[in-house]
Every structure is written in structure tokens, then in C-alpha cells.
Amino acid sequence: MTQRKTLLLCKWEHDLLETLLDSGNDVILVLDDFDAEHHHLEPKLIDRTARVYRVSSFDALSDLSAVAADIRLREEKIDQVISFTEFSQLGAGYLQSLVVEQPKDLLDWVAVRDKRLMKERVRAAGIRTAISLSLPDSGDRERREYIKKTLRFPVVVKPALGFGTMSTRRADTPEQFDAILDDFHYEPLVPSRQLTVEEFVTGRELLVEGLWVNGEPEFFVAGSYLEPRLASIGSRSGDTEQLPDGAVLLLREENAQLYERLLDFCRRVNAAFHVTDAVTEVELFETPDGELVFSEMCTRLGGGAVVPMVSEHLGEPVWHIIGRGLLSGEARPREVVRRYVGFVNLVPEKPGVITSLPPVDEVAAIPGVARVWPVAKVGDALSLSHGAEFCYIVIFGSDDRDEFDAAMERVMTEYHVVSTPAGTADSTSAR
């Protein structure tokens, strides 16, 4: 008989929480203010947990310390701390260092968040990645001069502990580099003001989602962005033709050699961070000469449309698969249900207030469309400044390649999100 465990789950995720509770284990839930204010917390699930702690955020050490102290006072044994978002990764690492009997090295948790330490570890493992330098203070003129003399332009400037492409800028010249830093904009969600600067890498941008149990993949799915993320985001100013924002999953049987290379690549990346049992996303580039270049990794799935896209591919909510795998090591999903899967995120041509969205029922009725997810609504203001600003997501899924391609092409060409500058009105149709 499997021994009953006590699990500490950080943040709200319905499907994952449900799977953990259905396993018969005790689940202690830690929620932050964002969870309470923005998620529909289901009382029936909440009532099944051992108890719930509330913290202001997972960056608040005093709140997390109080949670750990209460657990210690109860003399409870916590078998596993589970975190699935970047917003809770550092806090979860801190908690497990205080409440788990044999905690993982806290620096391992930091290394999958801080991009400077991340790339240092990857380089030490012999994996190619962009040359990069730390910029702890954007106003440090001496350090900036050193960076300009050392790195080859263009370069990418981004927060060392950022989220996706928030506050990420490309500088093509030393002069542009200085101009960006003289007036650097930090998105509100970016917690640290320290930056990293790295040389720009060209090529096809890939993403790899995996669940690892005892060092082996329970699922391993690779995809390719329609356009490199920075190029897509950079085209949103309205001054140039807008590039599509989306991705397609790559079938293993059609890309067997690439999958073999990616599996070896990700095993080496995991080893650099001592990852054996975790969910991971690895982003990388395939250069024009075919070389794989590491970009970033995290111990969570990709954001935005990645979770529903992978779920569509595997035929069930991916959090159910992850929950089973992390608990029992037996999570192998069923055979791929949808062979061809992808997504696009429709955004307005220019920043502003949304005045019209494509009709959901009409888009959903297109053969090859699996799901329509209008993240934003009419009246919302979009800055279009980073890739985590999702607007109108369409998930595609089909066993027929022609149907799949036709659906993606039709949605991207026939349907549009319309916006106007703040303070104006417009009733233009979204189609």
C-alpha cells in the first residue's frame, strides 16, 4: 500500500489540486493575494485540503517564514513542496528549505530563475549559449562601457529575474543600448531591478515541454514559434508589418532526428540544475547551420497558450498527467490524440483600447479549431509591450495537416482584434 504523503502546493491550479487530492494524500495549500483576487477558488476543493495558508506574495519572506514556523510548531512532516509558476518558484524553494527533511539546494531554485546564474551553469556543462554579462545597476556607466566593449551587437537587455519577455529590449548599437538603459521600463511584475545583457542569437526559436520522473521523460513535446519571440513582439509598434504570435508542436515521427538531439540537449540541461523529478520548459534556438543554442529553462510549463496546446496534443489536461507523475512516477499519457496542434494569439495592430473582438462561436466552428480563449475583453487597454500580454488565443488541433494549416491561415488572415488609442471610440468590426 502506498504511504500517505503530505504535500505543500504553492498557488492555485484547479486541475493539479484536484489530481493531488484525488490521490488520497494530504494537501496543504498556500495562496497569495493574486490567487484570492483573480482566481475562482472553488469551495468544494478548498474544503478537501488539510488547510490553506494566505500570503501577500511568494516574495514576502516574513509571510513565508510564518507559514514555515506554523508547520514546524505542528510537527508536521512535509514530503514534497510543489510549485508550478515562476511567481512562486523562489518562495517555494525557501519554504522547502525550512520544512522538508532533506531539502534540495536552495541555489538550484535560484538558478532556474536568475538568468545570469542559469547561463553560467549551462556554460559550465559545455552547452552553447549566448555570451552574456551581468548589469546589477542600469545606471553604472563604467559597467555599461565595459559591456559595450566586450559584447558584439546587437544585444538583448532583460531583467535577471524576469518573466518571459517582460521588459526585454533589443539594442542594435551601443548608442541605442545607452538610450534604452537611460530610460529603462520595468514591468510591475518584475521583482528585481538587476539586469543581464546578452548577445543576440539568430535562428528558429524552439520550445520543449517535459515531465521528468527519476530522470526520464514521462512526456516530451517540442514545438517551434511561428516567429522568434522578440521579432514578433518588436513588430507590434504599428510602424512595421505585424508578425504572427504563435507556435506549432512538432510531431516526433516527422522530426525524429531533431527529437533525438533535443532529448540529449535537455538531459544535459537538467543535469546542470540537478533536475530529476520536475516539470520543465527549455527554450532554445536552432541556428541556420543547425546548432542548438540554449536560451532559458524553468521548472514549470510554458505560459499562455502552452498548457492548453499540450493538453490538446495529449488528450487530457496536462496538469492531471503532471500530478500523477510527481506522485507515483506512473503518468505516461495516452497516445497523442491530436497530431497537429498549434496556437495563435491575435492582438491589435497598435496599442490602445480594444473595441472589437472576433466572434467566439464563429471562430470555434472553423474545422481544425479546437478552442477559442478570449483572454482580453472589449474595453481592456493593451500596451503590446511584451509577449505575456495575451489577448485572443486560438488553439488548433487536427489529424489532417491540410485542415490544420488552412485553419491557422484563415484565422490569422480573416479575423482581427481592433483597438483605438485611449480616449477615442471606434465600432469597427473585428472581421
Where are these regions (language model features)?
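Conserved N-proximal alpha/beta basic substrate-recognition cap immediately N-terminal to
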Residues: E42-L135, L384, E389-F390, E403, ...
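Short, well-ordered beta-strand elements within core beta-sheets of diverse protein domains
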Residues: R169, E199, L250, S311, ...
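Peripheral (often C-terminal) accessory segments that flank ATP-dependent C-N-forming ligase machineries
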Residues: G323-R431
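Structural motif
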Residues: K5-T6, D79-Q80, A222
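Active-site nucleotide/adenylate-binding loops and adjacent lid/helix of ATP-dependent enzymes
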Residues: D114-T196, V201-T202, V213-N214, L250-D264, ...
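Domain-scale detector for complete catalytic domains at protein termini or as standalone homologs
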Residues: Q3-R74
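ATP-dependent carboxylate/phosphate-activation module, predominantly the ATP-grasp catalytic core
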Residues: E175, E199-V275, V279, E286, ...
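Short beta->alpha connector loops
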Residues: L9-D15, D33-F34, F87, P136-G139, ...
